[in-house]
Amino acid sequence: MSASVSPLAPKYYPAMPVIHGVRIATAAAGIKYKGRTDLMLMVFDRPAEAAGVFTRSLCPSAPVDFCRRNLVHGKARAVVVNSGNANAFTGLKGREATQATAEAAAKAIGCATTDIFLASTGVIGEPLDAGKFSHLLGDMAESATEDFWTEAAKAIMTTDTYPKVATETVLLGQVPVTINGIAKGAGMIAPDMATMLSFVVTDAPIKADALQSLLSKGVGSTFNSVTVDSDTSTSDTLMLFATGTAAERGAPEITDAADKRLADFKKALGRVLKSLALQVVRDGEGARKMVEVEVTGAKSAASAKKIALSIANSPLVKTAVAGEDANWGRVVMAVGKAGEPADRDRLAIWFGDIRVAHQGERDPAYSEDATSAYMEGEDIRIRVDLSIGRGKATVWTCDLTKEYVAINGDYRS
């Protein structure tokens, strides 16, 4: 956790409502950090429906492998998350640590290890000593409360500078249902299936298969559209749980993601996922500016997204933003290197509402002073129109500063 809060941090945090059927506890286990919580336990009083998406890294962490196996059952009784150690690339010791943690959690809750989900975040390659925290899980299960969401978000932080929380309440069959979410992430953010770590819970009675469909679709325009440094974590985990307790108030049980009664719920879930994803970007390591990259007029949506990510991941573009330099030529470079269809002589580029390039050259009305003044803001929008099709996409990133280098250069010290 950083000593200073990002200037892009939210000005206020939402009051996180209680979701019946789920309780949370945190503890300071001293896994890596001193004087702060680094362990989170989420307990479901009754089996919750479970869905998840995980990293596509070919070097996944032991907890990711464990979660994938358990997700087949579609039920959850507890989630255990530790920060400070990723338990990735740790071989047999890593697998033993996950098993020991799962067994301790199952004993504390009174369930099978197949109902336990695990996540770890932190340094890669260092064995995780489950003995530092497994003995705490029993007391945590007893003391867990329903109104501990922000504290849970704090416990899973690493280089984050603020906790990331989001909530929405929406009607399902005329009954209010709630969606709460927490996330962590500040570096190694270029998710292919999720983000670093994020956990979302609803009291809506939605079955696991439908929940999985909702989540898999929801990540496309949210967590799969953000990048801080183009590095995909070995530990990326996003899970969605449904306690179903709203059924006691008359909410209908949903078994199919295509159920029309889910229309408002889908939108609310999308807002929660987007809020969490953008909070991750705004807390990018060393970030001082948020950058939205919009690409229109591409051959396809997939092509537009690849071009947008080429721009968003370009160190030259990101450092230009950090230096408040209106160097639009770097955007041209990033479009050209993306490997997607583009026509130089149809290309147009905007910084905010200022068109800086048009039809293969600098815009005749270009003003260096006006564009430079725009670049001084905290929220920067780069728009590119290829004018060769109807594909469009939007991604989000942050600038690349000296602080990013310092944070990652000192990460293990």
From Swiss-Prot:
Transmembrane segments: none
Swiss-Prot/TrEMBL site (Involved in the stabilization of negative charge on the oxyanion by the formation of the oxyanion hole) positions: T121, G122
Gene Ontology annotations of biological process type: L-arginine biosynthetic process; ornithine biosynthetic process
UniProt-annotated catalytic positions: T195
UniProt keyword Lyase present: no
GO cellular component: cytoplasm
Keyword hit for Iron: no
Job description of the protein: Catalyzes two activities which are involved in the cyclic version of arginine biosynthesis: the synthesis of N-acetylglutamate from glutamate and acetyl-CoA as the acetyl donor, and of ornithine by transacetylation between N(2)-acetylornithine and glutamate.
Protein family membership: Belongs to the ArgJ family.
Name of protein: Arginine biosynthesis bifunctional protein ArgJ
